[in-house]
Amino acid sequence: PDEDDARTGTPFHSYWLGKIGNAQIGPIYLGKLGFLSLVCGLVAFEIIGLNMAASVNWNPIEFLRQLPWLALEPPLPEHGLSVMPPLNEGGWWLMTGFFLTTAILLWWVRMYRRAVQLGMGTHVAWAFAAAIWLYLVLGFIRPVLMGSWSEAVPFGIFPHLDWTAAFSIRYGNLFYNPFHMLSIVFLYGSTLLFAMHGATILAVGRYGGEREIEQIVDRGTASERAGLFWRWTMGFNASMESIHRWAWWFAVLCPLTGGIGILLTGTVVDNWYLWGQEHGIVPSYPEVYTPAVDPAKGG
C-alpha cells in the first residue's frame, strides 16, 4: 500500500541458518512504527544501563562483574503514585517504564498491521498481547490499584527474581494461588504439547508430515499414522489443525491466568496460605510441639 515504507536490506543466504530454518536473511520491513519502537526501546535500555553503571561509580570492570545483581529500583513507598518523584528515588524507573511500555505497544501495533497487510490472521499479535497483559499487571495495573509504584518489579536480572521470591513470601506463598496453579498447568502443558507435536511431525517426516497445511485439508498417510499412534498409545488424538489451537490456547492462557493471580494478590487476598486453609486447599495441622522461641528475639 502507498502509506507503507519500502523494505530494507538486500537478501542473502546463510548455510548454517539453513540447518535450523529458512536460509534466507532479509529483507526486513521496519516501517515508522518499528522505527519508533526501536528508538523507545533503546532509550529505556540506555537509562537502565547508565543507572546501573552509576551505581558502581562508572567502573567498567565492576559493572561487568556485578551486572547480574545490579538494578534500577521503582520509586520509594513514600512517593505513592507520584508521576514526578526524584530521579534517584524512582524517577528514572518511571521514565524507563514509560519508554519500554511505549516500545512494546508500538511493536504490537506493528505486528498486528503486518499480519493484516499480508492477509494473515492476527493470532501472533493476540498471543503477544497476552504476554503484554502480564507485563502491565506487574508494572502498572497492580501498583496503581495498590496505590504505590513501589509495588512494581525492579529492572535487573537477579533483582527481579529476588522480587518474585519476596512477593510470594509476603503474601503467604503464591503456590496456593489458584490462578498461579492454572498458569503453571498451562506453562508445563505448553511444553508438553510442543514436544508431542514436534516429535510427531519429525516421526512422520518421511511421509511428508511437515506439509501440515496439506495434511489439514487432505489427510494423507502421515496424518493417518500419527493419529493411529496417539490413539493406540493414549486412546485419543488431535487433528493436524486442532493441535495448533491447543498449543496456542495453552501458551496464551499461561500469562493470562498468571496476570489474574498477580492482580488478586494484595488487592483481594492478603495471604494465600490462609486463603487456602479457609477454602480446603491447605490442610490445618494441629500443634503437636511447643513452638520454638526465636533466640534473636530473646531479652
What residues fall within each predicted segment?
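Transmembrane alpha-helical insertion/packing segments
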Residues: 2-111, 158-160, 168-184
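Cytosolic-side membrane-entry/anchor segment at the start of a transmembrane helix
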Residues: 75-95, 111-142
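Long, low-complexity, intrinsically disordered extramembrane tails
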Residues: 3-16, 43-46, 222, 226-228, ...
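Juxtamembrane/interface segments at transmembrane-helix termini
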Residues: 52-57, 109-122, 141-154, 188-212, ...
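Loop-to-transmembrane boundary segments
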Residues: 18-41, 118-128, 171-185, 227-260
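Membrane-interfacial helical/loop segments at transmembrane boundaries in membrane proteins
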Residues: 55-84, 143-174, 212-232, 271-299
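Hydrophobic alpha-helical membrane-insertion segments
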Residues: 36-53, 125-147, 185-192, 253-263
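Cytoplasmic membrane-interface regions of multi-pass membrane proteins
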Residues: 9-25, 56-67, 72-76, 100-127, ...
